[in-house]
UniProtKB/Swiss-Prot annotation:
Protein name per the record: Urease accessory protein UreE
Keyword annotations from UniProtKB, A to Z: Chaperone, Cytoplasm, Nickel, Nickel insertion
Function: Involved in urease metallocenter assembly. Binds nickel. Probably functions as a nickel donor during metallocenter assembly.
Keyword Chaperone: yes
Biased composition (Basic and acidic residues): 176-185
Ranges annotated as biased composition (Basic residues): 162-175
Alphabetical list of InterPro entries matching this protein: UreE, UreE_C_dom, UreE_N, UreE_N_sf
Subcellular location: Cytoplasm
Any one annotated GO CC term: cytoplasm
Length: 185
């Protein structure tokens, strides 16, 4: 096996999904290294992380709409594959029974500036105790679970938008600076 230069080129593109690239025969016997990301890191355009083996990887994803998802492949060579792992996190899960209930839930959650994610027929959002309690009081029957947040709805505050309100609520240390990039200091 050839020794790979530990410094990779800057990652500027997502090459495809791991399962699809394996089915196409583009990934065969190469070892697969993972870059673990929190859900809020997947929105960042510029990012520096390390793989599970300690290899440093730099991302510069400047194309519109590029967002890292679980099992995205960002590097392929004859000796190595690097794929993304979105780490599971505590989430609120809603299972609306009707389209009007889905619309109301999304509207109300979006109005509170929380990022929304789709997981099949369910709506998920990062766990926040005040939000969970508000959803219970509003009759939505939320559940707490641990899941990967990866299919973000595009028209909400997690993507950033141009207005703000003078109020605050607890995001358990996660916040953004009006740019939609949630993070923790």
């Amino acid at each position: 096996m050839k020794i790979i230069n530990p410094i990779l080129p800057i990652i500027e593109n997502i090459l495809g999904n791991l399962t699809a690239l394996q089915a196409e025969g583009k990934i065969t016997t190469q070892p697969i290294e993972r870059v673990a990301l929190q859900w809020y890191e997947s929105e960042r355009n510029i990012l520096r992380k390390t793989t599970n083996t300690g290899r440093e990887v730099a991302f510069r994803l400047l194309k519109e709409g590029q967002r890292l998802k679980h099992d995205d492949v960002v590097f392929i060579s004859d000796e190595l594959v690097i794929a993304i792992e979105i780490l599971p996190s505590d989430v609120i899960v809603l299972s609306p029974k009707t389209l009007p209930e889905m619309a109301r839930a999304c509207y109300e959650i979006g109005n509170k500036h929380s990022p929304l994610f789709l997981d099949g027929d369910e709506v998920t959002l990062p766990y926040d105790k005040p939000m969970f309690e508000w959803l219970q009081a509003a009759g939505f029957h939320p559940q707490k679970a641990e899941r990967r947040l990866s299919q973000a709805l595009r028209a909400n505050s997690a993507q950033g938008h141009g207005h703000s309100h003078s109020h605050s609520h607890d995001h358990h240390g996660y916040h953004h600076h009006g740019d939609g990039h949630w993070h923790k200091h």
